[in-house]
Design a protein with these regions (language model features):
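Ubiquitin-like/PB1-type beta-grasp interaction modules and other compact soluble beta-rich domains
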Residues: 1-80
Length: 80
């Protein structure tokens, strides 16, 4: 099981900032998250980057029991 951290609009869509979700790969964990959190989360997920332990990874990347999956929506802002 991987610890999943959700930020900004992903957190809002899921209704939580973190969860523990079973899956052997990033893709399996994300599919399980979509099933758990519903269509609004699925829509937001399509705009997000997914990192594992601070690294950008492919969907087929294997996950271990202590891995942390971060779902990061695009950010903007700052000063001009």
């Amino acid at each position: 099981m991987a610890r999943v951290r959700l930020f900004a609009s992903a957190r809002d869509a899921a209704g939580t900032g973190s969860d523990v979700i079973a899956g052997d790969t990033v893709a399996e964990v994300l599919r399980a998250a979509e099933d758990r959190y519903g269509p609004r989360f699925t829509e937001v997920l399509g705009t997000c980057r997914v990192w594992v332990n601070g690294n950008d990874v492919a969907p087929d990347a294997a996950l271990g029991p202590d891995d942390e999956v971060a779902v990061l929506p695009p950010v903007s802002g700052g000063t001009t």
